[in-house]
Amino acid sequence: MANSGVMKLVCLVLACMVVAAPLAEAAITCGQVVSKLAPCLTYLRSGGAVPGTCCNAVKNLNNSAKTTPDRQTACGCLKNAYNSISGINAAYAGGLPAKCGVNLPYKISPSINCATYTLSLYNF
């Protein structure tokens, strides 16, 4: 089962890299977003206590996405990951940033419109 999850994650990273290629103005890539959040996968599927490594990853990702294009790219990558990785619980995904003390102006979901999110919507 672990190998299946790892393979899906690798495939998702590769797919995100291809999708993100046209977004040259964004410094962050889908590969970076997905690999940073890999420690959160177990929580996103099963819940329970959020691992410290997961919250560190969420905070690190939030700090890495400094510009509006970066934040829109990260949002799109999160949306794609949500839709591509089986077994992710919507409530766990939507509530993860807040559980880690990160304030996002949206909840991670399969229907989010990432183009509407700009840097000014974020509270630092």
From Swiss-Prot:
InterPro entries: Bifun_inhib/LTP/seed_sf, Bifunc_inhib/LTP/seed_store, Plant_nsLTP. Disulfide bonds join C30-C77, C40-C54, C55-C100, C75-C114. It comes from the Eukaryota. Keywords: Allergen, Disulfide bond, IgE-binding protein, Lipid-binding, Signal, Transport. SUPFAM superfamilies: Bifunctional inhibitor/lipid-transfer protein/seed storage 2S albumin. One of its GO terms (molecular function) is lipid binding. Residues 1-26 form the signal peptide. Transmembrane segments: none annotated. GO terms for biological process: lipid transport. The keyword Cytoplasm does not apply. Belongs to the plant LTP family. Plant non-specific lipid-transfer proteins transfer phospholipids as well as galactolipids across membranes. May play a role in wax or cutin deposition in the cell walls of expanding epidermal cells and certain secretory tissues. PANTHER family: NON-SPECIFIC LIPID-TRANSFER PROTEIN 2-RELATED. This is Non-specific lipid-transfer protein. It comes from Macadamia integrifolia (Macadamia nut). The gene is Mac_nsLTP.
